[in-house]
Amino acid sequence: MQTAQYIIELLKAVFLGIVEGITEWLPISSTGHLILVNEFLNLRQSKDFIDMFNIVIQLGAILAVMVIYFKRLNPFQPGKTAREVQLTWQLWLKVVIACIPSAFFGLLLDDWMEAHLSNFFVVAIMLVVYGIAFIWIEDRNRRVEPKVTDLARMSYKTAFYIGLFQVLSIIPGTSRSGATILGGIIVGTSRSVAADFTFFLAIPTMFGYSGLKAVKYFIDGNTLTGGQAAILLVASVTAFLVSLFVIRFLMNYIKKHDFTVFGKYRIVLGIIVLFYGAVKLIFG
């Protein structure tokens, strides 16, 4: 690949990292957006690499959670009281419990989902369906007080239920954060508790999923060139830096606002994607 072309590929990686850093945490589907953006940016790489790339760059976004919440998530943090250490371990146990459903169904259905549901029409439908769900749930939520307003008081059973909602995010266009935040609100948590738990749940979930994708990539006989590694690294670092801002933005945003605006965005985007997919199918 010529130098000019390679620089363009790196610039594309930066843009994709920005998209990942924004959409991983907002309930609007990061994978769905990456699939769409790749249509227009068209990374000059193999399909196997792009499929792996779309998942593995999420590690950069996940690292941002670990940096922002390091003290809260670290049971060995100096200065923590015995009670705080206990609560930290309990939090991690809740995260592990919530991971069980998606780990089971993810391993079972990942290949089938990728083969049959990674297309414009599925992404469009999921964008619209969950957009409507967010608007409806938030409208209902105005008349219902949340039962859980403190993550420390969230039960293990509630954590498991949220984990069941995370299974829905296996379908492209759903949004992992969208499914778990929506699930948290449905089972009675406040928006802030649902968002916090979504961030923490992302750590083992996305590390596991990214690792699975990377392993499959190499098992299928693919290799990673130095240029591809650089593209992956640039996108991941960009996703990390953007995520640092977006996570803080979202936590401040939900103190005064609900998720209705994201529901409306999903519906509009879903209609656009559906139209684009139809045009592409008809005219090629």
From Swiss-Prot:
GO terms for cellular component: plasma membrane. It is a multi-pass membrane protein. It comes from the Bacteria. Its EC number is 3.6.1.27. GO terms for molecular function: undecaprenyl-diphosphatase activity. Keywords: Antibiotic resistance, Cell membrane, Cell shape, Cell wall biogenesis/degradation, Hydrolase, Membrane, Peptidoglycan synthesis, Transmembrane, Transmembrane helix. The chain crosses the membrane at residues 6-26, 49-69, 89-109, 117-137, 167-187, 192-212, 227-247, 259-279. InterPro entries: UppP (IPR003824). Its main location: membrane. It is found in: Cell membrane. It catalyses: di-trans,octa-cis-undecaprenyl diphosphate + H2O = di-trans,octa-cis-undecaprenyl phosphate + phosphate + H(+). GO terms for biological process: cell wall organization; peptidoglycan biosynthetic process; regulation of cell shape; response to antibiotic. Catalyzes the dephosphorylation of undecaprenyl diphosphate (UPP). Confers resistance to bacitracin. PANTHER family: UNDECAPRENYL-DIPHOSPHATASE. Bacitracin is thought to be involved in the inhibition of peptidoglycan synthesis by sequestering undecaprenyl diphosphate, thereby reducing the pool of lipid carrier available. Belongs to the UppP family. This is Undecaprenyl-diphosphatase. The lineage of its organism: Bacteria, Bacillati, Bacillota, Bacilli, Lactobacillales.
